[in-house]
Curated annotation (Swiss-Prot):
Its main location: secreted. It is an enzyme of class 4 (lyase). One of its GO terms (biological process) is lipid catabolic process. This is Dermonecrotic toxin LgSicTox-LOXN5. Belongs to the arthropod phospholipase D family. It catalyses: an N-(acyl)-sphingosylphosphocholine = an N-(acyl)-sphingosyl-1,3-cyclic phosphate + choline; an N-(acyl)-sphingosylphosphoethanolamine = an N-(acyl)-sphingosyl-1,3-cyclic phosphate + ethanolamine; a 1-acyl-sn-glycero-3-phosphocholine = a 1-acyl-sn-glycero-2,3-cyclic phosphate + choline; a 1-acyl-sn-glycero-3-phosphoethanolamine = a 1-acyl-sn-glycero-2,3-cyclic phosphate + ethanolamine. Dermonecrotic toxins cleave the phosphodiester linkage between the phosphate and headgroup of certain phospholipids (sphingolipid and lysolipid substrates), forming an alcohol (often choline) and a cyclic phosphate. This toxin acts on sphingomyelin (SM). It may also act on ceramide phosphoethanolamine (CPE), lysophosphatidylcholine (LPC) and lysophosphatidylethanolamine (LPE), but not on lysophosphatidylserine (LPS), and lysophosphatidylglycerol (LPG). It acts by transphosphatidylation, releasing exclusively cyclic phosphate products as second products. Keywords: Cytolysis, Dermonecrotic toxin, Hemolysis, Lipid degradation, Lipid metabolism, Lyase, Magnesium, Metal-binding, Secreted, Toxin. Its EC number is 4.6.1.-. Expressed by the venom gland. Its cofactor is Mg(2+). It comes from Loxosceles gaucho. Binds 1 Mg(2+) ion per subunit.
Length: 8
């Protein structure tokens, strides 16, 4: 997944 941003 994307580790560039944190999605809660």
């Amino acid at each position: 997944g994307d580790t560039r941003r944190q999605i809660l």
